[in-house]
Amino acid sequence: FCGLFSSILWIGLPIVFFRLIFLNIDSFNGWDYYQILFLVGSYTIVDGVMMGLLIRSMGILESDILSGNLDQILLRPFDTQLFYIFRSFNLVQFVNTFFGLAIIFISYGNLNVHLNSLKILFYILSLMCGCIIYYSIWFLITISSFWFPTKFSKVDVFLNYIGISKYPYNIFTGINRLITMLFVPNLLIANPAVLIFLGKDTLNLFFYQIVFTVFLIIISR
């Protein structure tokens, strides 16, 4: 029950935050309230799936790195990364995915968006890339324990870092946006999918997301 309550609180806070902002303005850098709500919902879908898979597994991986138990795992005849991805689930976190779906359906009902099968396909593919980016960032932060062991958990580092993913990427402008995309790639988790869905982007950011996804796959292997 406590986990479910914290999930509702975690999802509800940004919704309330944006609602308060839009009490005084009609749009924010070209985004209205329901468009941002759609972004929050889309990110929550990715977050629910990946947190359900990884919130325990990444902690176990970090512990195995620090204790030396990883050496024994590496000698086993299976893919080590897949082993850790599916090693332990958190079912409460998976519930967030359904909250995310509810949010996007509610927001979609208030959006003037023309849908077609190609747009839906690109949206789904982009969210899948977002899942890979989400995992890769968390994995790379976790394995940094090889070189930079700390007294605090790398899980906390990741959770503090990933929160910005639910915000529109174009709150940054000019050179700041370029720097942000290079050094804060978590903004690529949900933004490209939502921009495609809303018709705000001509697939440019989506193609950049694909390239960056391939790059992360290579370096995380």
Predicted features along the sequence, with ranges:
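Hydrophobic transmembrane alpha-helices and immediately adjacent juxtamembrane helices
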Residues: F1-R221
